[in-house]
A protein has these predicted regions:
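A polyampholytic, Gly/Pro-enriched intrinsically disordered region
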Residues: 83-102, 243, 269-277, 346-383
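Conserved interdomain hinge at the start of the Helicase C-terminal
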Residues: 289-304
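Short, polar/flexible loop-turn hinges at active-site or ligand-entry regions and domain interfaces
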Residues: 32, 36, 57-65, 79-94, ...
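Conserved beta-strand -> loop -> alpha-helix junction used to position metal-binding or nucleic-acid-contacting
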Residues: 63-80, 328-354
């Protein structure tokens, strides 16, 4: 790579994003226009954080930062595409009909697990292999041999690839991967003074080619990431491209996330990675603690914020089930263990019991979840259409709902009896309420996979050490040590 560049290695918690925003700050202070600065990444999360931080620090709107984008978004806009150009569900149905096969059109991968997973239809596994070959910039034959998945037929693979190419050509359609490859082929890029490539260790070879197009038209390019956190090789990532992207290397030296005890444990694992860049950095000044437990029942999680991480989604679901059995409030993949609309309906009913007036939208929310037939009915059947005739700014009390809008429940009725709930869910919510959990707030306990939580932090972190046979027998154990 012949353009001016610098590789910024950011170990966990070393202020990588802060460092990159400072580069933006310096450029703006020198008079560089915001539309001459590019900030790209594979993930929307990284770009969104950069836009928010830059906008807050420099009073800039997202529109004034047109090149703070994901690579897919930049390809989409750079090629002048519209939504109608993309392969949609209707296209996959038509393609299925033409090929005499069944395709969902959903790439058979799971970024949380870090595994390639088959969907319900076997033919989608061929689509995944076709897509991964394009991302890795290898032939179908090379991809087929590398995966060693001989349950799939190579001649069928080639037939599907050829049919898909013809369909997209005939109907003028593109896939998400085509956005990247198309941008690389057209070869033009905006003139930038600064290009920042964040989380660069997660880029696949095709994305590196796109970055090359951008960097060739930029005065200075900064790559940022950490090869020790390159945990997406399953998706086609080649960490060597990251490690060799620039001759000028700067390592951030101080972690503001890792206490000494966690730092020492992490280093004992990192030393097992053979293919890595050596980097020395210091932990936080506080010691912290690392303890080993047989299971979560031995942990007192009644206070504080906790993240519980597992290797796969399946293990994460097992952890969530265990927390539920213990009567603990948690979220998994961002979803709370009690739906927010249920929690809000409980609050609405308890407000009515205390004499509070509620608005029409709250009436609709409560009524929508209330049983209207059978012995447990608390609302008259057929009352919902009448709510549409009510004034939008109307207010209601328990008494007015009984008199005018079909409320049957006694005022002392338990909030859980006001809702359609299964027996197990009823017991679970009652246990949470006994613990004085506030169900309308974000849970203190967060369940996740390692891949989904990458880059996150918490006061207390629980790491489940269970693994799978495919992980344990993986011939490249560098992947597992990084995870």
């Amino acid at each position: 790579m012949t353009y001016p560049s610098e590789l910024i290695l950011g170990p966990p918690g070393c202020g990588k994003t802060h460092t990159l925003i400072e580069i933006v700050r310096d450029a703006l202070s020198r008079g560089v226009e915001p539309d001459r600065i590019g900030y790209v990444s594979f993930t929307k999360k990284a770009v969104t954080e950069a836009v928010e931080r830059a906008g807050s620090a420099f009073n800039l709107t997202p529109k004034s930062l047109p090149y703070f984008r994901t690579l897919h978004s930049l390809g989409y806009s750079g090629l002048g595409l519209s939504q109608s150009d993309l392969m949609a569900r209707e296209d996959w149905k038509e393609f299925s009909r033409m090929m005499g096969m069944n395709f969902d059109g959903i790439i058979a991968s799971d970024a949380d697990d870090g595994l390639i997973l088959p969907q319900g239809r076997d033919h989608d596994r061929y689509l995944r292999m076709i897509d991964r070959a394009a991302l890795r910039c290898v032939t179908l034959g090379e991809e087929y041999n590398d995966q060693r998945n001989y349950d799939l037929d190579f001649f069928m693979l080639f037939k599907i690839w050829r049919g898909l190419q013809k369909y997209k050509s005939d109907y003028g359609k593109v896939s998400f991967t085509d956005m990247i490859s198309g941008y690389v082929k057209q070869g033009s890029a905006p003139k930038l003074e600064i290009l920042i490539v964040d989380e660069a260790q997660d880029l696949v070879p095709l994305q590196w080619k796109m970055v090359e197009v951008l960097a060739q038209n930029s005065d200075k390019t900064y790559f940022a990431g950490d090869d020790d956190q390159a945990i997406h090789r399953w998706a086609g990532v080649d960490v060597n491209l990251f490690m060799n992207c620039s001759q000028n290397v700067r390592t951030l030296k101080k972690s503001y996330r890792l206490p000494r005890s966690a730092y020492d444990l992490a280093n004992s694992v990192v030393k097992r990675i053979h293919n890595r860049k050596q980097k020395a950095f210091d932990p936080m000044d506080r010691e912290g603690t690392v303890n080993f437990h047989m299971d979560t029942h031995n942990l007192d999680m009644s206070q504080g914020s906790w993240t519980l991480m597992s290797r796969t989604n399946s293990f994460a679901r097992d952890v969530a089930a265990d927390l539920r059995d213990q009567g603990l409030f948690y979220e998994i993949k961002g979803y709370p263990s009690v739906k927010l609309e249920i929690a809000e309906a409980i609050n609405i009913w308890e407000g009515l019991q205390k004499g509070r007036e509620i608005g029409l939208h709250e009436v609709k929310r409560l009524y929508g979840l209330a049983p209207k037939t059978g012995d447990g009915a608390v609302i008259k059947r057929g009352i919902m259409p009448l709510l549409d005739a009510e004034p939008l700014d109307g207010t209601y009390t328990y008494e007015s709902l009984v008199q005018n809008l079909g409320l049957l429940a006694q005022k002392e009725t338990d909030a859980l009896d006001m809702l359609r709930l299964g027996k197990d869910e009823r017991y679970y919510i009652r246990a949470l309420l006994r613990r004085n959990e506030v169900l309308t707030e974000r849970p203190r306990l967060k369940v996740s996979t390692f891949h989904a939580m990458k880059g996150g932090e918490d006061d207390n972190v629980v790491v489940h050490l269970d693994s799978t046979k495919s992980c344990v027998t993986n011939p490249d154990q560098d992947d597992e040590h990084r995870v």
